[in-house]
Amino acid sequence: MYLYIRYAAMSLFVNYIRNVMYQKFIINQDGVLKFGNVYLHRYLLDKGERCPYGGGLWKIDERRGAIMLYGRSFDFGRPDFDFVRSVDWSFLGGNEHPLLYLPHWPDETEVVPVVASNIKNQ
């Protein structure tokens, strides 16, 4: 009986973990900043895609009317915004928003605008 209860509890935990999603972003090899709601950053990659420029987490800041980018990816490391060439807004309904980076999150006293070189929105 004890083993059955333990197995059932472990099954519930595994199913819970599989269903937990986080707001994450990556910067792929083409410099495309992609948003998603996934458990792992690597789930944002399409087949044949790589993520050499890192990633992190994002949240919508209603007060600022912006997307706040923060943290780092355990899969790919800290984001390097110098390589952003375009932003894929499709996950956010195709609507553009200012992008602001919080380098010392959760401290929001320093906010850095993300400016892409040769930016073209997809």
Where are these regions (language model features)?
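Intrinsic low-complexity, intrinsically disordered or marginally ordered coil/linker segments
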Residues: 2-122
